Amino acid sequence: GSIDELIECAHRWPNAADVGPYIRQEDGSAYPSARAIPTLSNGIGHALLSGIWPNNPWSKAYRDNAVMDKERVAGWLSGSCLLVRWDAFCRIGGFDERYFMYMEDVDLGDRFGRAGFTNVLCPTAQITHAVGHSAGKHPESMLPAHHESAYRFQADRHPHWWQAPIRVMLWIGLKIRSVVVVGFTK
């Protein structure tokens, strides 16, 4: 089964900190579960344009071109299903508890990469994931939570005093986006 496939994949990639499966959504489509680490530019471009221009260059860069059928290294893997190497997990201090919801898997994958490990997509292992069932019903609380996590992720990666204007603009931009998007969903 899929767990056996993940274990075999982990053996093929001895430097992998985590291995994740191909994730199928309930409608049968692939969930982009292996992506690039979001930078400021592709994160902003994706956040602003993905709803009106799904294949914009920033979303493509963030989605890592959505290649989900090839065993490969990714910046991060969806936390909905992961096989994780315990020693690697302990070495980076596990999950960052400041993330309530969203981006905890992005942060984990990024920190694995910074510690010299890889994150590997193993498409021969497959699962179905009911994406966003509870989150989709409450965008007024879930979208701000997502934005808080996105801010935390980027703020942690831009911590210097001279990067304060970036953090301020990002915080303001995400607050405005939350108000606008939640307003449109009501």
Spans of model-derived segments:
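Conserved donor NDP-sugar-binding/catalytic core segment of glycosyltransferases
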Residues: 1-34
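Short, flexible, basic/aromatic active-site loop/helix in glycosyltransferases
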Residues: 21, 38-75
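Active-site-adjacent helix/loop segment of glycosyltransferases
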Residues: 109-185
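Histidine-centered beta-alpha loop that forms part of the nucleotide-sugar donor binding/catalytic region
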Residues: 21-23, 79, 104, 132
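Short, hinge-like loop/turn segments at secondary-structure boundaries
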Residues: 34-40, 137-140
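A short, conserved alpha-helix in the catalytic core of glycosyltransferases
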Residues: 4-6, 66-126
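Residues that scaffold the ATP/ADP-binding catalytic core of kinase and kinase-like folds
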Residues: 33, 43, 47, 91-92, ...
